[in-house]
């Protein structure tokens, strides 16, 4: 009658709902937020206190809760205060732990020193951490590597991919394969050594400064009289001193006067390595002025100029023997002597020797702590001199490293000395007063602007090489030319990095810019003639020209890797082809500037770097012509080669190497003519048997030649617009009319294409091996006439778009 109820409700529920699903746990209470984000409030959904909130993270949109939460109430402020207190407590605990570990390491080091008698330097945290990352070091892979020159006599020398020697090797390899000739027959490898005929017969070597030669006391150097020495030393102050301001003129004059004290009128001065190396540099420079006015004695003038270098080289060797004994206790004067030794080697194109000697010179500068902030109490004029010396070494280091494609020796992270200045106070401290009549510059402004330019270009090239290593890491390819996508990625990256160089151009003082005739601008590639200011001081004219030549020279080495042999379709690499043409424009700018200046003035007469700039510009122009025999900029490039040969003829009377260089350019240009003639004949040759355009053979003939694939437009249309620019000279008038007729009445590309797959319709990329094995492809005249114009609609570049590339600085 009475029912029994169990007090255990959970057991009763479990027995009653044994087969039912268990009751789910209650949903946790959501965290309260002071203010929801804008998106959650707009959609009236629950928000959280994350930054950004979870809803915005899930949808991938912007969240307004990105700023740190501000305390809007007293409890929130108390929570924020408590959080900060806890954070401070944690940081204090970390500091205490670090101090204890440092004391333990110091105690252990003291015990080791007490037991062994030798101190062990403590390892930094970075080094300690590096041992744990040894697996990463063992797994590192090399990136883009250079190519050793063929026929190397001294073993394998490394020339990086940014060097001109690497580019010469690429040109030589391409010529050898395209012309079916061995490498030794291309005559271009002789230029890698920068022409041996130009250097002295006895090159400087370590034996010149060996202890045996010093103990023997043999010195074949013929001393000069004081008037003769002063004649050559006077050339220093208007030439090299304005470019490399590393000597205090008043201090040097007092020092030079002391060398002649207590000597007889017919006697010789006291030994001085600084004076000897300055005489070597000035005699090499002054020998270029010792030419005859008779044009019939050009060969004799060249030999006379070459023989005039020998006395200067004898002074250089004697300076090296004297400097060898000063290495243990160097001084600023010893450092100055080494710097001008590098300049001398650079001027006679012994670049490897100069680069090796630069390493010794930098160690001397480190020993004298020139790379650090000057000590307190150092006179201001001494501080400024030390800064000028150090940053001159920086310029030489980067110029040689970029030329040879090798890593820089100076690490900017270890340098704490400031940049030199060019204000009136700095002019007073330098001890040299050269009036220019311009308020915005001084004679030191060139040095400062060169440092800033090299710093900007070095950053661009370092970032570019790092990007190359990242893309090539893990890839079997050894260079960037196998994958068009990689090349285009690098071109896009380089274009972004060039912003620093463009900013430098905008900030160059107006008085250091070379004026142009017409509407031309300085540091541009618009090919406008210079408006030379012959009334300015000679040193200022030279500084303006050298600054712009250095700018174009550095950009040539930056853009040069994008010249490809043979090029691929430009529809895949429009940015890379833009850099290709920019490199050519800078090369032609150097040629035009040097030809005008050497023809109209004597400002750069005898200036050795000008010859080296011209040679690198010639290599770039030759490479472009060989890689792109038929394209809009090629006629201008070929004219620029003729201008460059005339420039070499102008300096041939005082640079014997220029005569050899002109002959090499003529020979290689003839080979380029043969390639162009072969291609031109393939365009005009009518084949006896016509194959169907839709057959496999016909499809192969419709493929464009490799030289024309290089410059196709990235933006492709269904029909070709009216051509407003002239076509290459290989096209006949009748062919031109047919092409224009076809462009006026275009045929839809879908009606012209065979019914094949899209892969078969796109023009295949012509690799280097394929182009060399098959030779230059034979294209019938129907391709130009319009009967086989399929590939032109797929990849031909609109000629009007070339202005976008040629006007880029």
From Swiss-Prot:
Location of the protein in the cell: Nucleus
Physiological role: Transcription factor that regulates the expression of the gene cluster that mediates the biosynthesis of patulin, an acetate-derived tetraketide mycotoxin produced by several fungal species that shows antimicrobial properties against several bacteria.
Listed Gene3D superfamilies: Zn(2)-C6 fungal-type DNA-binding domain
Pfam families: Fungal_trans, Zn_clus
GO-annotated biological processes: DNA-templated transcription; positive regulation of patulin biosynthetic process; positive regulation of transcription from RNA polymerase II promoter by galactose
Comp. bias (Polar residues): 118-142, 207-216
Organism annotation: Aspergillus clavatus (strain ATCC 1007 / CBS 513.65 / DSM 816 / NCTC 3887 / NRRL 1 / QM 1276 / 107)
Protein name: Patulin cluster transcription factor patL
SUPFAM superfamilies with a match to the protein in the record: Zn2/Cys6 DNA-binding domain (SSF57701)
């Amino acid at each position: 009658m009475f029912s029994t109820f169990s007090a255990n409700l959970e057991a009763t529920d479990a027995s009653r709902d044994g087969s039912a699903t268990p009751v789910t746990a209650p949903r946790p209470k959501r965290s309260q937020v002071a203010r929801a984000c804008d998106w959650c409030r707009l959609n009236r959904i629950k928000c959280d206190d994350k930054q950004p909130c979870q809803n915005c993270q899930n949808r991938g949109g912007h969240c307004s809760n990105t700023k740190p939460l501000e305390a809007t109430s007293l409890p929130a402020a108390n929570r924020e205060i408590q959080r900060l207190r806890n954070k401070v407590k944690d940081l204090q605990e970390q500091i205490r732990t670090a101090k204890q570990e440092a004391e333990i390491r110091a105690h252990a080091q003291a015990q080791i020193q007490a037991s062994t008698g030798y101190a062990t330097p403590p390892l930094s945290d970075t080094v300690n951490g590096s041992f744990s990352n040894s697996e990463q070091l063992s797994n590192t892979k090399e990136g883009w590597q250079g190519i050793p020159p063929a026929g190397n006599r001294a073993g394998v020398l490394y020339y990086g991919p940014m060097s001109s020697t690497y580019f010469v090797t690429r040109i030589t390899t391409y010529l050898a394969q395209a012309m079916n000739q061995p490498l030794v027959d291309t005559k271009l490898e002789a230029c890698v050594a920068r022409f041996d005929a130009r250097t002295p017969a006895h090159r400087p070597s370590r034996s010149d400064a060996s202890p045996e030669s010093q103990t023997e006391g043999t010195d074949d150097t013929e001393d000069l009289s004081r008037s003769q020495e002063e004649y050559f030393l006077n050339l220093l102050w208007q030439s090299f001193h304005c470019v490399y301001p590393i000597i205090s003129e008043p201090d040097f004059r007092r020092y030079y006067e002391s060398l002649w004290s207590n000597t007889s009128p017919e006697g010789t001065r006291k030994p001085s390595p600084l004076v000897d190396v300055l005489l070597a540099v000035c005699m090499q420079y002054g020998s270029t002025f010792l030419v005859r006015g008779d044009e019939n004695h050009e060969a004799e003038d060249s030999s006379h100029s070459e023989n005039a270098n020998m006395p200067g080289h004898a002074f250089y060797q004697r300076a090296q023997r004297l400097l060898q004994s000063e290495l243990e206790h160097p001084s600023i004067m010893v450092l100055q002597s080494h710097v001008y030794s590098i300049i001398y080697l650079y001027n006679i194109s012994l670049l490897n020797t100069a680069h090796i000697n630069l390493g010794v010179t930098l160690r001397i500068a480190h020993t004298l702590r020139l790379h650090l902030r000057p000590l307190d109490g150092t006179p201001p004029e001494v501080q400024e001199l030390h800064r000028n010396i150090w940053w001159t070494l920086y310029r030489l280091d980067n110029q040689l490293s970029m030329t040879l494609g090798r890593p820089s020796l100076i690490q900017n992270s270890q340098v704490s000395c400031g940049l030199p200045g060019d204000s009136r106070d700095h002019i007073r401290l330098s001890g040299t007063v050269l009036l220019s009549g311009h308020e915005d510059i001084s004679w030191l402004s060139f040095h400062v602007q060169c440092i800033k330019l090299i710093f900007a270009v070095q950053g661009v090239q370092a970032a570019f090489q790092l990007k190359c290593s990242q893309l090539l890491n893990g890839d079997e390819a050894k260079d960037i030319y196998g994958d068009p996508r990689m090349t285009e990625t690098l071109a896009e990256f380089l274009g972004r990095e060039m912003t620093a160089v463009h900013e430098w151009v905008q900030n160059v003082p107006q008085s250091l810019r070379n004026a142009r005739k017409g509407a031309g601008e300085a540091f541009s590639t618009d090919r406008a003639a210079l408006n030379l200011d012959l009334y300015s001081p000679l040193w200022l004219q030279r500084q303006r020209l050298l600054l712009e030549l250095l700018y174009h020279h550095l950009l040539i080495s930056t853009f040069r890797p994008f010249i490809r042999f043979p090029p691929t379709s430009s529809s895949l690499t429009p940015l890379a082809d833009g850099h290709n043409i920019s490199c050519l424009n800078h090369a032609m700018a150097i040629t035009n500037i040097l030809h005008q200046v050497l023809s109209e003035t004597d400002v750069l007469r005898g200036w050795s770097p000008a010859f080296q700039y011209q040679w690198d510009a010639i290599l770039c122009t030759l490479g472009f012509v060989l890689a792109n025999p038929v394209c809009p900029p090629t006629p201008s490039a070929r004219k620029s080669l003729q201008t460059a040969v005339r420039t070499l003829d102008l300096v041939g009377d005082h640079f014997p190497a220029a005569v050899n260089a002109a002959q090499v350019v003529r020979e290689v240009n003839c080979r380029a003519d043969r390639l162009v003639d072969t291609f031109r004949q393939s365009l005009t040759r009518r084949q006896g048997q016509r194959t169907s355009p839709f057959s496999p053979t016909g499809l192969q003939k419709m493929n464009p030649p490799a030289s024309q694939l290089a410059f196709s437009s990235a933006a492709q249309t269904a029909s070709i617009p009216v051509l407003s620019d002239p076509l290459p000279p290989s096209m006949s008038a009748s062919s031109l009319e047919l092409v224009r007729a076809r462009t006026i009445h275009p045929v839809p590309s879908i009606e012209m294409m065979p019914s094949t797959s899209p892969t078969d319709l796109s023009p295949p990329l012509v690799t280097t091996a394929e182009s060399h094995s098959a030779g230059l492809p034979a294209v019938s005249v129907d391709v130009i006439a319009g009967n086989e114009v399929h590939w032109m609609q797929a990849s031909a570049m609109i000629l009007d778009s070339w202005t976008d590339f040629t006007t880029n600085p």
